């Protein structure tokens, strides 16, 4: 039963893929270890017309079925990034519950996937992908099946009383705002060239959205492309903020206050050689000066603490390596996944493959005794 439910969810996930590609993947999954390994190799070498998210998902499914399939760095990096915000205690707790589940039916009692946060779900997926031999086949299949069920539920026609067209329109608006944000980041940080490149990509995506908005064929592909841009824009924004903290700190410390300057500042209100116009008396001026100095000192201390935290994260916790990897995948990808996905979306639009039927809103049938019905 577990294997059949996984196949059904995989087929539902691939509903927007070209029919021959979908058939080839399903045939590989049902054809045994040798067929699955061959298909995983084709996916890894990008010989199948799949978008980046589809490719990594299918590789995760195949490795969960057959641990002999070697992990793919692209899929591992995606999982690491998705779980980077998860607390260590939460990760330990999730792993303990997974091992205690025992069998396929036991996954339901500890999962309740719809109540889980995305990073908790991805922690489970990462566990069965990175350490498949630590879990029984039923636990691996149950985890991946539930993950696919969540992804398929999120792609239903209506969700939270907002139509798919309405959600896409909101996302297009976010793309335009991202383009403006990248323009601002290019002007204030040292990430100018990369920010401008990402801005051009967001503008191109916005133009493509305007031309294809309302197309049932293009809607899921546009949403995936927009989601990819959102992640890259978010990473660029975080890098820009870290860059600004360093710049502001060194701008302030480049001109430290001397004792003489401090004395001059404190006695500024007693200066009778210059004509000044103000509405403060002597005591008020003295207090305002002290308050300004106090705020300046607090700001300096805050920035210094931020610098120390970043140094600790880099040298002690080893997070700089992961951050550098994020920078590489964000601004220097080996293959621009977004452009590749957009090109594939255009190809699918031209071929007119697998257009959803507006009159058919019935869900894809699944077994009534499936354990993940909540």
Curated annotation (Swiss-Prot):
GO terms for biological process: monoatomic ion transmembrane transport. Glycans are attached at residue 270. InterPro entries: CM1, CM2. The record marks 259-260 as: Cleavage. Residues 1-238, 310-374 are cytoplasmic. It comes from the Viruses. One of its GO terms (molecular function) is structural constituent of virion. The modification Phosphoserine is found at residues 337, 362. Residues 260-288 are extracellular. The chain crosses the membrane at residues 239-259, 289-309. A lipid is attached at residue 324 (S-palmitoyl cysteine). Keywords: Disulfide bond, Glycoprotein, Host cell membrane, Host endoplasmic reticulum, Host membrane, Ion channel, Ion transport, Lipoprotein, Membrane, Palmitate, Phosphoprotein, Signal-anchor, Transmembrane, Transmembrane helix, Transport, Viral ion channel, Viral matrix protein, Virion. Palmitoylated. GO terms for cellular component: host cell endoplasmic reticulum membrane; host cell plasma membrane; membrane; viral capsid; virion membrane. Belongs to the influenza C protein M1 family. Homodimer; disulfide-linked. Homotetramer; disulfide-linked. Ion channel, which might have a role in genome packaging and uncoating processes. This is Polyprotein p42. It comes from Influenza C virus (strain C/California/1978). The gene is M.
């Amino acid at each position: 039963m577990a294997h059949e439910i996984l196949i059904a969810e995989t087929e539902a996930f691939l509903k927007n893929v070209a029919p021959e590609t979908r058939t080839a993947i399903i045939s590989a999954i049902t054809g045994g270890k040798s067929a699955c390994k061959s298909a995983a190799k084709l996916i890894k070498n990008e010989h199948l017309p799949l978008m980046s998210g589809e490719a990594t998902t299918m590789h995760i499914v195949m490795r969960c079925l057959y641990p002999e399939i070697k992990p793919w760095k692209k899929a591992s990096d995606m999982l690491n990034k998705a779980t980077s915000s998860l607390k260590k205690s939460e990760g330990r707790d999730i792993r303990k519950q997974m091992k205690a589940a025992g069998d396929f039916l036991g996954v339901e009692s500890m999962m309740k996937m719809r109540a889980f946060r995305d990073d908790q779900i991805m922690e489970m997926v990462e566990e069965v992908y990175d350490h498949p031999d630590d879990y029984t086949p039923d636990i691996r299949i149950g985890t991946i099946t539930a993950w696919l069920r969540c992804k398929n539920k999120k792609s239903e026609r209506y969700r939270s009383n907002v139509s798919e067209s309405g959600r896409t329109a909101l996302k297009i608006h976010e793309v335009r705002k991202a383009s403006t944000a990248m323009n601002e980041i290019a002007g204030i940080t040292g990430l100018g060239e990369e920010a401008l490149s990402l801005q051009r990509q967001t503008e191109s995506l916005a133009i493509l959205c305007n031309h294809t908005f309302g197309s049932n064929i293009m809607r899921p592909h546009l949403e995936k492309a927009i989601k990819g841009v959102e992640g890259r824009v978010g990473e660029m924004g975080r890098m820009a903020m870290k860059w600004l903290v360093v710049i502001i700190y060194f701008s302030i410390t480049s001109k430290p206050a001397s004792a003489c300057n401090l004395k001059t500042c404190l006695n500024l209100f007693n200066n009778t050689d210059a004509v000044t116009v103000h509405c403060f008396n002597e005591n008020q001026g003295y207090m305002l000066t002290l308050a300004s100095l106090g705020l300046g000192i607090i700001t300096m201390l805050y920035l210094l603490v931020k610098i120390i935290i970043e140094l600790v994260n880099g040298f002690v916790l080893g997070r700089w390596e992961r951050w550098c990897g994020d920078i590489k995948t964000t601004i220097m990808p080996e293959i621009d996944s977004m452009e590749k996905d957009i090109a594939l979306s255009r190809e699918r639009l031209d071929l007119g493959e697998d257009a959803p039927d507006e009159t058919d809103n019935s869900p894809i049938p699944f077994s009534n005794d499936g354990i993940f019905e909540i």
